[in-house]
Amino acid sequence: NVKGAVKQETFEALTDYVIKTYFKHPSYWKIDGAPYFSIYEFHTFLQIFDNDYAKAAVAIERFRTKVKAAGFPDLHLNGVLWALKGEVLNNAVQYFKLNSATSYVWIHHFELPSFPSTEYAVAAEGYFNGVASGGANNGLEKPASNIPIPYHINVSMGWDSSPRCKNSDDWMTRRDYPFGPVIVNNTPS
């Protein structure tokens, strides 16, 4: 079994559960009446269906049908951009009728420049410049306006992956994740 992927039956059970437990809750976020559902890693989602877009599209359409049967106008399907690059994004829009894209965290698009910490304002500027003008990473190489579906910006409140460093003696040495800088000074004035 691939790390992170689940069985197709598990995905089907998940869709039933989220419709019943979450989508019907009065405070659940809906866009134009459609419950918002986001897939974090499309490549992992595709592994459930042996990387076959057509098979995965059938499962998404079944999900949409269940959502409509539950009384909603449709499903608002969102994809997290860092794993939706190039052909994967285009295929997700085409096969799954992806409604929007978003970002999980600024650092997926903008490498924090200073170590052991980077100022919040610097991280914000890097991310929002990528959204507006491109030149960033993982889906924001071009401005967000080039994405063929609406892009919902992200407001990261900070970033600190140091607790994931497993008490390493050299946790203060910059290298690959999670040994990176933290975002500091995000307190509004």
What do these predicted ranges mean?
Residues 1-189:
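Glycan-processing catalytic domains of CAZymes
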